[in-house]
Amino acid sequence: MPTAPALGALLLLLGALTPGHQEKLFHSRDHSDLQPSPQHQAELVTDLQSAQQFLSKYGWTEPVKWEGTSSKNAAELPRYGDADLMQEGASISRYGQEFPLEPTQAPAFVEALRKFQTLNGLPATGKLDDSTIAAMNKPRCGVPDNQIGKESAIVKSNSNNVTEKASGKSLNTTTNQNPENGTSTSKIRKKRFLQMLAAPVRYKDQANQGSTVRGAFSKKLLKWRLIGEGYSSQLSIDEQRYVFKTAFRMWSEVMPLDFEEDLTSPMSLIDVKLGFGRGRHLGCTRSFDGSGQEFAHAWFLGDIHFDDDEHFTAPSSDSGISLLKVAVHEIGHVLGLSHIYQTGSIMQPNYIPQEAGFELDWTDRKAIQMLYGTCEGSFDAVFDWIWKERNQYGELVLRYNTYFFRNAWYWLYENRKNRTRYGDPVTVSLGWHGIPAEGIDAFVHVWTWTEDATYFFKGTQYWRYDSENDQAYIKDAQGNQYPRLISEGFPKIPSPINTAFFDRRDQFIYFFKDAHVYAFDVKRNMVANHYPKRIIDVFPAVVRNNHPFGNIDAAYYAYTHNSIFLFKGKEYWKVVSDKDRQQNPKLPRNGLFLKKNISEQWTDICNVHSSMLKMR
């Protein structure tokens, strides 16, 4: 245990307490790749005729009928050895229809070309120049940008304006600021932008019933499978499955849907089927064009096909086309997202090489949440973990990381980015050694002039944690063996408790049990006078009857907000701070402000399916 002078020096550094660096991930998204074996090359856009075909194919001239023309049922798929499975049909145009040999620059063509140029950050000249041809020849998704019966969500890139649809309607939305840090100049503009991203989707069969679909799937668990007829020739089967598992997990980390790989159920019960093919493939009504342009296509509520003529590589490769990035994009289509021309968005139609560590950005996360909602739920414990390190000048500084515990999982929350760490949640047993693997009741950090100790509580016991060695004590310097009974270390505190926290202002631990709270004086090692008391008496409601009353899930002092929070269910109450009372003396001490949803303050804390907790 640190000496009093040492602790005094540490406490002087509290004012400089800063969020900690990102904790190392416990599973990697990076794996080696194999070399490609392309067999066909895509035809390039080179002239007016092929440019007109391109604009028509992807819905720039007029919307394209796409949904409802997906692949056949699995039972109708040809066998793996079928000669047509991996071959390009010579009699079928790569664009699926015929065009005049000498297209004229009709007003519709010129207007479509201008729209395409604008959304690709090119001068809107309406003329087919080299830059426009180069943009058309970039590797891209095969899903049209504008579809019949479906609202598009096309956002102008590198601009201060957000363009609504391909019609050029402007929302005048600022997009060059980072929405994650909450510094957007207009919440109204941001809301309108998000509403545009999640424009209602209406299809023919649903329109007949008068229904408008905002979320593609109504159920919470989706099953997926890489079909046996459609393995890639470039990567091992295990590598392919791992990449797809990672892609589904990345979406699950930011939305309230679970994804599970299912290798045994009848194909009719599989929600999303994935496969590779060349040319005419997998019984699909659409043909792939060979290496160099269209790399995949997908259908709303349906299947995903990848062109095996493309050079697909694993995430760690700096060459070829990242299968992970393409898979994440196509899964977005299956879930209901349209193309988004927005810098950083995974839903851009063109493939853009990504640096290591690619993840879903703010636009993608908020777009999918507009369809499916945000992640909500209760937590077992929430706390800031304080640790010490020396900076580049050799000075001792204190830092903290914020953690959320639920069942057997935990998340590290990056307050500066207002989201969880990429790759979370992970299992408690993987990151916290020697404490119970699930169901933690409380975390307490006792921090005084004479004591610096951290404890985890569960049931009738508690554990002291050794932060230096990153594991629970078996026996501490005072000779105490762990786990200990709560009644031994904290006399007259009942167990099990609901939650607890240490208040540095009065140096009491507040233990919550049902509708009561116990203030424990750590200096005297006893319950404070006149306790227990009703929670509502110690933490009164600022607004009458707006109060948790009892059975608190978690109590948390947040260094980011310099405030105490009480959590119950999906909601939280902020405790009136000394600063709040200085600004408004009428506020009661330790009063509870109006409740709010946890997901409004701490975003994207999402479960993933249990099968995805261990990625390999």
From Swiss-Prot:
Residues 1-22 form the signal peptide. Its cofactor is Zn(2+); Ca(2+). InterPro entries: Hemopexin-like_dom, Hemopexin-like_dom_sf, Hemopexin-like_repeat, M10A_MMP, MetalloPept_cat_dom_sf, Pept_M10_metallopeptidase, Pept_M10A, Peptidase_Metallo. Glycans are attached at N161, N172, N181, N418, N597. It is found in: Secreted. Residues 23-192 form a propeptide. Disulfide bonds join C375-C606. May play a role in gastrulation-related cell movement. Plays a specialized role in the generation of left-right asymmetry during embryogenesis. May act as a negative regulator of the NOTCH-signaling pathway. The conserved cysteine present in the cysteine-switch motif binds the catalytic zinc ion, thus inhibiting the enzyme. The dissociation of the cysteine from the zinc ion upon the activation-peptide release activates the enzyme. Residues 157-186 are annotated as: Disordered. GO terms for cellular component: extracellular matrix; extracellular region. This is Matrix metalloproteinase-21. PROSITE patterns: HEMOPEXIN_2, ZINC_PROTEASE. Keywords: Calcium, Cleavage on pair of basic residues, Disulfide bond, Glycoprotein, Hydrolase, Metal-binding, Metalloprotease, Protease, Repeat, Secreted, Signal, Zinc, Zymogen. Binds 1 zinc ion per subunit. Its EC number is 3.4.24.-. The keyword Secreted applies. Pfam families: Hemopexin (PF00045), Peptidase_M10 (PF00413), PG_binding_1 (PF01471). It comes from Cynops pyrrhogaster. Belongs to the peptidase M10A family.
